Structures are given as C-alpha cells and as structure tokens.
Regions:
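N-terminal beta1-alpha1-beta2 module of alpha/beta enzyme domains
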Residues: 1-87, 208
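Hydrophobic faces of well-ordered beta-strands that scaffold small-molecule active sites
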Residues: 3-7, 55-57, 88-91, 119-123, ...
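An alpha-helical appendage that flanks or caps ligand/catalytic pockets
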Residues: 5-25, 142-200, 239-350
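Active-site mouth loops of central-metabolism enzymes
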Residues: 22-37, 94-102, 206-215, 271-272, ...
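Acidic (Asp/Glu)-rich catalytic clusters
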Residues: 48-49, 79-85, 112-118, 224-225, ...
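Conserved, mostly hydrophobic/aromatic
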Residues: 51, 59, 80, 111, ...
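Glycine-rich, proline-tolerant flexible connector loops at the mouths of alpha/beta enzymes
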Residues: 54-74, 95, 234-235, 356-367
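A conserved active-site cap/scaffold subdomain adjacent to cofactor or substrate pockets
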Residues: 213-239, 243
Length: 383
C-alpha cells in the first residue's frame, strides 16, 4: 500500500475550536504565514526520511485567516524536491481554471524533471469564490448565489484547460481550438508566416500520474473516462463504496479493462493516533472543530450521511463524535487506527492511502509527532 501525507499548510493557532473567533474574523500575519511555509517544507523532509510515498499540498489564495497559506505548491515542490531523495510530490489540488493551462503545464513539467520524475499532477476546479473570481474564473460554491451558472462555466473552462494541458505535456507539437481556449491564437506573425502550432518547453522526461478529487456526479463520470486517478475524501463509507465501484465501472466502459480493487483510486482520511482513544480524541477535537467551522459553510460536509440515509444538507457542522461514528475520521490508539485502515482496505481494496494528520491550528511539532507515530506504530501493520 502506498501511503502519503497531505497538509493544508496553515498557521498555528492557540485558540482553535468551535468557539470564537469566527473563521471570518481571523487574520494571520505575514510572519506567521511564512513560518508555516517553512515548516511545510521541513515536514516534507521528515516524511521523506520516514519512508512515506508521497507528500501533497493544497493551492489557495488570499487566505488571510491562515488556514491554507501556500498559493503555489508546484513552486514550493521544487524546493522540496531539492531537499528530499525519494518522496513523490503532489498537489491536492492545482486549481486549473485559476491558471493559464500552458503555464501550469510548463511549471509541472519543470517540477517533474527537477525531481527526477517525482511530480504528481493533482487537478481540481476550486471551491472558494474569493479565489476563483479574483483570479478570473468562477466557481459554484455552496454560498455562491449563481451557483449553477458559475459551476457550468467553471466546468467548461476546466475541461478545455485539461485538454490543453494533456496535449502540451504529451505531444511534441500541438494546437487546440475550443470555445474557451484558442491556442495558438490565429494570425500570430512569425518570420514571414503565422504560428500554426506550439511546443511545450520543457516537456516531462518521465511518466506522470494525474489525479482529481471526486466531488460530484459529473466528476465521477469524467475522471475515469479520462483515465486519471480519483481521490475520495470526506464521504460516509456507504457513499464512498458506491462511488468507488462506479468509478471502476466507468473506467471499464471507457477503456475496456477491469481495474484491480484499489487501482487508480486514493482514499484520504483525517487521522490522529495517541496512546488511547480518549487521548487521541482530546488531541484532535480542537482542530476538528476549527476545520468544520471553516469548511462547513463552503458545503464540504455534504458527504456525511443525514438521518434519512441520504447526504447531509450542505452547511452541516459535524461534531467529532459524528465524524467518528460515520467513519469519516480515524482516531484512536495505534491498534485502533490500524484496524480502521484495515476496515477500509477490506471494504474498498485500498492501495493508495493519503493521511491528513495535522488539523487547522495544530502546531507543526504536533504534526511531526503524528507522522512519526503513524510511521512507527501503524503503517508497519501493512508491510
């Protein structure tokens, strides 16, 4: 089983929890944000030394609250590549509509080559209107009043951008003429003629994987048809199992090949390990509650199960007890955490596991303790 670590990359908070301050009232300093950035790099080195397979960062912008302060994981990934030996470096996720697709392709190819083929192309459509609309696109967020129109526009832009990125990364010469992107634009003069095609420089020297989060029915159909890997997070196991199996069905329909039970699918789980379940719950509760105080209003808890057995209503702020009861978070002693991971392996055939061991507000010292304990006390159970 390949096991990676995923961090938001936020500032430390000594008042994390369900109470005040409200998420919208938080303001981190530039010094705090930069300290977090340096510690994110340090943590990558620790994870490399401990033998984790991969290390994933988020892309977010204008987050004065301090929850996610890394705007360009590829740029940071280049530094990580220089300081590590073997760990793969992924983005969860590059928000594709916020980039020009050719700049994203160039930057990823540069990281991939610099690292000797350790880059992972993680792509997404975004979740936060503050970021998307400021950077020239739209997103159908839960709190966006024109959600449907914005989502349709975003999806169309994402689809074309990914067409461009895949062409640029895999073909020596390419051109693309769609509704959103027209590349190269017609009529560009070049030494007596006009530009008819482009070549990405550099292009990847090594094979690479592409992964996208599975967050909606259209995405569940699109990702396997494209042949990419799907990332599953923050869903009740009933919903995860249904989508996990549907992913394999769509892949087989599109490509004529049956996937192995865990192939091309990654499970993400928030995790906390301690000597006892009670101690682990006490450790993780402030960060759990801060996380949902922050993300609940964006609709991130829609993967929880409501009392009617259907997805919970958007805007739910779950308690830690609900997260544990629904098996969406994995918290306990090393044996209990191992048992819960094995439960998912039995249910889904998981072969790619991404652990989220550091909650919003947690200290990096606590995060480092978690990755050490998981590597020493939990992961050897799956050797």
């Amino acid at each position: 089983m390949r096991t990676g670590v995923f961090l938001f990359g936020g500032v430390e908070m000594d008042d994390a929890g369900p109470g005040p301050p409200a998420s919208t009232d938080r303001r981190s300093t530039s010094e705090e944000a930069w300290e977090a950035t340096e510690r994110v790099i340090d943590m990558a080195v620790v994870c490399d030394d401990l033998g984790y397979d991969s290390y994933w960062l988020a892309e977010h912008h204008f987050q004065h609250e301090g929850y996610e302060v890394v705007p360009n994981g590829i740029l940071l990934g280049a530094v990580i590549a220089e300081r590590t030996q073997r760990i793969r470096i992924g983005m969860a996720f590059n928000i594709v509509p916020q980039w020009h697709p050719l700049r994203l392709a160039e930057d990823f190819a540069t990281l991939h080559n610099l690292s000797g083929g350790r880059g992972i192309l993680g792509v997404g459509r975004g979740t936060v209107p503050r970021e998307s609309e400021t950077l020239g696109t739209r997103i159908g967020s839960f709190d966006n009043p024109d959600k449907a129109v914005a989502d349709e526009s975003n999806r169309r832009q994402f689809d074309e951008a990914m067409d461009v990125i895949q062409l640029a990364l895999t073909e020596e010469r390419f051109a693309y003429h769609g509704e959103v992107y027209d590349l190269p634009p017609p009529g560009i003069p070049d030494r007596g003629g006009t530009v008819q095609e482009l070549t990405l420089v550099p292009r990847p020297l090594h094979p690479f994987e592409t992964w996208q989060a599975i967050t909606s029915p259209p995405t569940l159909e699109q990702v396997p048809r494209r042949g990419w890997g799907g990332v599953f997070w923050n869903n009740h196991p009933t919903f995860t199992k249904r989508n996990w199996d549907r992913f394999a069905e769509v892949f087989e329909e599109a490509h004529g090949r049956t996937l192995e039970p865990g192939e091309k699918r990654t499970l993400v789980r928030c995790v906390c390990v301690a000597d006892t379940r009670e101690e682990a719950m006490a450790k993780v509760r402030p960060g759990h509650d801060e996380m949902w105080k922050f993300l609940g209003p964006y609709g991130w808890s829609k993967g929880y199960m409501g009392p009617d057995g259907k997805p919970a209503k958007a805007g739910l702020i779950p308690s830690l007890e609900e997260s544990l009861e629904q098996k969406i978070w994995i918290v306990g002693s090393a044996d209990e955490v191992g048992e819960q991971i094995q439960w998912y392996r039995d249910l889904l055939g998981v072969e790619d596991l991404l652990l989220f061991p550091m909650m919003p507000g947690d200290s990096y010292k606590a995060g480092e303790e978690q990755v050490h304990r998981l590597a020493a006390d939990v992961l050897p159970k799956f050797d």
